[in-house]
């Protein structure tokens, strides 16, 4: 349900963009994002930090896009957000010596340090690839292609990354289960 709520503003943006253009789509995205955050707060009593950050960026860049009637602001948002997420993951691992993914999920999952490090680097790489893809698609393809890729391409890539994460973690989770059963 939560993932569906997170996807609704994007689908609304895409639909309104195709039907009415950039300005109306940006306004729709901003309003839908604010409503989404309110609904998340009401239903789940908490909004994750990453959701707040995304919400703030969407509202800020969405307002700029609507005001100037220029899709480039939302294109920059995607690049900045992916770069920011990659930077946070890399800094957590190489500066603070503890992957942020481990800090977030370490209570739910018991994994060896090298697995946490690879997982963290894998997601950092994913965000860097998304950032670079966004730059290429933003500047070398039409706005229509970018809007379609933003809506469906990044969603598909995220799904593939999540599945790859599950496949990577599965053998390690099995080892943890076997260790717990032997104890």
UniProtKB/Swiss-Prot annotation:
Coiled coil: none annotated. It is a multi-pass membrane protein. Its main location: membrane. The keyword rRNA-binding does not apply. GO terms for cellular component: plasma membrane. Keywords: Cell inner membrane, Cell membrane, Membrane, Transmembrane, Transmembrane helix. Pfam families: IspA (PF04279). The chain crosses the membrane at residues 19-39, 53-73, 76-96, 121-141, 151-171. Disulfide bonds: none annotated. It is found in: Cell inner membrane. It comes from the Bacteria. PANTHER family: INNER MEMBRANE-SPANNING PROTEIN YCIB, INTRACELLULAR SEPTATION PROTEIN A-RELATED. Plays a role in cell envelope biogenesis, maintenance of cell envelope integrity and membrane homeostasis. Belongs to the YciB family. This is Inner membrane-spanning protein YciB.
